[in-house]
């Protein structure tokens, strides 16, 4: 850890098409090997697919992210010779990062034929509280609930 204090939060410019900082972060997380134009095509393609069914795609993406974002997670804490899984609250910036990561990972595992369709299907499912990303959040919450007895080890 840094001794000089916390690092400042990096700012992300809003995306050019929708003017949304959330969509810009989402594009950056979809990006692999620095190929931003490919990531933009994937995200905008997914939003076009969503737009066919729902006129306001940005609101649906935001709803999906809110549904997937975890409230608590477990962190390992070593006490004596034992390692405990201690439940801790998730701060807001990490909540969004985890939600985006889980949505993208779940979308990549789906069976649809193209990545924009996979991402669109996962976002639609997440907005309706179902799908792989929601399962991941539920699993995380279950782990925190099961280890609630160790909450006093919080740091």
From Swiss-Prot:
rRNA-binding keyword on record: yes
Subunit structure: Part of the 30S ribosomal subunit. Contacts proteins S9 and S11.
Any one GO BP annotation for this protein: translation
Protein function: One of the primary rRNA binding proteins, it binds directly to 16S rRNA where it nucleates assembly of the head domain of the 30S subunit. Is located at the subunit interface close to the decoding center, probably blocks exit of the E-site tRNA.
Sorted UniProt keywords: Ribonucleoprotein, Ribosomal protein, RNA-binding, rRNA-binding, tRNA-binding
Record CDD domains: uS7_Bacteria (cd14869)
SS bonds (residue pairs): none
GO MF entries: rRNA binding; structural constituent of ribosome; tRNA binding
Superkingdom to which the source organism belongs: Bacteria
Record-stated family: Belongs to the universal ribosomal protein uS7 family.
Gene, per the UniProt record: rpsG
Pfam families, per the entry: Ribosomal_S7
Species for this entry: Xanthomonas oryzae pv. oryzae (strain KACC10331 / KXO85)
GO cellular component labels: small ribosomal subunit
UniProt protein name: Small ribosomal subunit protein uS7
């Amino acid at each position: 850890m840094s001794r000089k204090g916390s690092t400042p939060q990096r700012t992300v410019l809003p995306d050019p098409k929708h003017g949304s900082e959330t969509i810009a972060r989402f594009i950056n997380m979809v990006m692999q090997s620095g190929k931003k134009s490919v990531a933009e095509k994937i995200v905008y393609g997914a939003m076009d697919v969503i737009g066919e069914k729902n006129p306001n795609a940005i609101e649906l993406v935001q709803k999906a992210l809110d549904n997937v974002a975890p409230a608590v997670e477990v962190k390992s804490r070593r006490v004596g010779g034992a390692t405990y899984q201690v439940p801790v609250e998730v701060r807001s910036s990490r909540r969004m990062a985890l939600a985006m990561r889980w949505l993208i990972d779940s979308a990549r595992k789906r069976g649809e034929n193209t990545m924009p369709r996979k991402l669109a299907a996962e976002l639609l499912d997440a907005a309706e509280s179902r799908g792989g990303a929601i399962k991941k959040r539920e699993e995380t919450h279950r782990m925190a609930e099961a280890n609630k007895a160790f909450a006093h080890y919080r740091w």
